[in-house]
From Swiss-Prot:
UniProt catalytic activity: Endonucleolytic cleavage at a junction such as a reciprocal single-stranded crossover between two homologous DNA duplexes (Holliday junction)
Family named by the database record: Belongs to the RuvC family.
Subunit and partners: Homodimer which binds Holliday junction (HJ) DNA. The HJ becomes 2-fold symmetrical on binding to RuvC with unstacked arms; it has a different conformation from HJ DNA in complex with RuvA. In the full resolvosome a probable DNA-RuvA(4)-RuvB(12)-RuvC(2) complex forms which resolves the HJ.
Catalytic-site annotation from UniProt: 7, 67, 140
Residue positions binding Mg(2+) 2: 67
Role: The RuvA-RuvB-RuvC complex processes Holliday junction (HJ) DNA during genetic recombination and DNA repair. Endonuclease that resolves HJ intermediates. Cleaves cruciform DNA by making single-stranded nicks across the HJ at symmetrical positions within the homologous arms, yielding a 5'-phosphate and a 3'-hydroxyl group; requires a central core of homology in the junction. The consensus cleavage sequence is 5'-(A/T)TT(C/G)-3'. Cleavage occurs on the 3'-side of the TT dinucleotide at the point of strand exchange.
Gene name in the database record: ruvC
Cross-referenced NCBIfam families: ruvC
Protein name: Crossover junction endodeoxyribonuclease RuvC
Annotated localization: Cytoplasm
C-alpha cells in the first residue's frame, strides 16, 4: 500500500509518500509544494493544486491521509486554511483516491507513543523509523510523513491492518516495541 500524507498550508504544503511492503515502510518521496509568496491566495491555491497533481501522478499513491482541521483563535487563518483544505480535497478526489483524516494527537501517538509530543519529537522519531538519515527535513514535511505513517500504522489501508483483521499480528504495545527495537531510540 502507498499512502500520501499531506500537511496543507497556504504558503507551503508538506507531502510525504510512504509505501508499506512486507519488509516494512519505505519513503518514496517527500517535500514541499511552495506557491509564489507574492501571488494572491487564489493563485497560490491553484499552484498548490498543480503541485499536488504532479506528486500524485509521479508517486502513484493509493490513498491520502490528512490531519483534521484545527481551528484556533484567528478566524481569518481558519478561513484561509479551509479554502486550502477544500482545494486539496478536490484535487485528491479528481484522482479518485480515498481520503482519511486523523487528529493531531492520534498522529503523534502513533509515531512517538505519546499524544503530547512536540513536532521536533515526531520529526526525530520518523527520521529513525523511516531511516531518513541525518538530513533534517522541514517540519511541514515530517508532519506529512507522520500523517502517512499514522494511516499505515493504524491499519486503515495497510498490511498490518489486514493482519489485525485476521487476528494475527496483534500489537504488543509501545513498551514491547521499544524493547524489541532499541536501535530506534535516541
Amino acid at each position: 500500500m502507498i499512502v500520501l500524507g499531506i500537511d496543507p498550508g497556504s504558503r507551503k504544503t508538506g507531502y510525504g509518500v510512504i509505501a508499506e511492503t512486507a519488509a516494512g515502510y519505505r519513503v518514496l518521496g517527500c517535500g514541499l509544494v511552495r506557491p509564489r509568496a507574492a501571488d494572491t491566495l487564489h493563485e497560490r491555491i491553484s499552484q498548490l493544486c498543480a503541485g499536488l497533481d504532479e506528486v500524485i501522478e509521479q508517486l502513484k499513491p493509493e490513498a491520502v491521509a490528512l490531519e483534521t482541521a484545527f481551528v484556533g483563535r484567528n478566524v481569518r487563518s481558519a478561513l484561509i486554511l479551509g479554502q486550502v483544505r477544500g482545494a486539496v480535497l478536490a484535487t485528491v478526489m479528481r484522482h479518485s483516491l480515498p481520503v482519511r483524516e486523523y487528529a493531531p494527537r492520534e498522529i503523534k501517538l502513533s509515531v512517538t507513543g505519546t499524544g503530547s509530543a512536540c513536532k521536533e519529537q515526531v520529526a526525530a522519531m520518523l527520521s529513525r523509523m523511516l531511516e531518513l538519515g541525518g538530513e533534517l527535513k522541514p517540519l511541514d514535511v515530517t508532519d506529512a510523513l507522520g500523517i502517512a505513517y499514522c494511516d499505515l500504522a493504524r491499519g486503515a489501508s495497510s498490511l498490518g491492518g489486514q493482519l489485525r483483521k485476521n487476528g494475527k499480528g496483534r500489537s504488543k504495545g509501545w513498551a514491547a516495541f521499544v524493547n524489541e527495537h532499541p536501535e530506534l531510540m535516541a
